[in-house]
Regions:
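Short, flexible turn/loop "capping" segments at secondary-structure junctions
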Residues: 21-25, 79-83, 140-145
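PLP-dependent enzyme catalytic core of the Aspartate aminotransferase-like
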Residues: 39, 120-173
């Protein structure tokens, strides 16, 4: 009986106070936080360069990035943020087939439904993060079969632009 109540007490404590980490894990987390601002600044600078490089490509119908003057909330972004952030969305002509072809042609950028890594990651929201929504609801939200979301990492922006440009060239052929 005492064992059972102690066990439930531990569960209650974890549910209401969260898990506890080891001292080493805390130290690693602290070391990462010390450079977080520098990393996000660099990633945001790269994201803006990449977003600009995607504008006007014949296979892309739109580039969605709040750091671009063409974004409908650009002024709000300037008021609330120092930079436009690390995530770019862009819409490919050709739908899901084009989106998957582009993702599979990338060499540096990883395919994943995660965000915010030191490595650049691309995802297809319609089949990952938003797959449970109805097609009508996805359409209302602007999540089409051609939409890709790129979370920019710490790689050199020129290398990422080259990787994306190469994958886009493969679509045109």
């Amino acid at each position: 009986d005492a064992l059972m109540s102690r066990g439930l007490g531990d569960v209650y404590k974890r549910q209401h106070t969260g898990g506890s980490m080891s001292p080493f894990t805390g130290w690693v987390l602290l070391k990462g936080l010390e450079t977080l601002d520098l990393r996000v600044q660099a990633q945001s600078d790269s994201a803006l360069e990449i977003a600009k490089s995607l504008i006007g490509h014949e296979s892309i119908s739109s580039v969605i990035y709040p750091g671009l003057e063409t974004h409908p909330q650009y002024d709000l972004c300037r008021e609330q943020m120092e930079k436009g952030g690390t995530v770019i969305a862009f819409e490919l002509l050709g739908g899901k087939e084009a989106a998957f072809s582009l993702m599979n042609s990338l060499e540096l950028v990883l395919i994943s439904n995660n965000l915010g890594d030191a490595k650049s990651i691309i995802t297809h929201p319609a089949t990952t993060t938003h797959q449970r929504l109805s097609a009508d609801r996805r359409q209302q939200l602007g999540i089409t079969q051609g939409l890709l979301r790129l979370s920019v990492g710490l790689e050199d922006s020129k290398d990422l632009i080259k990787d994306l440009s190469s994958a886009l060239r493969n679509l045109v052929r």
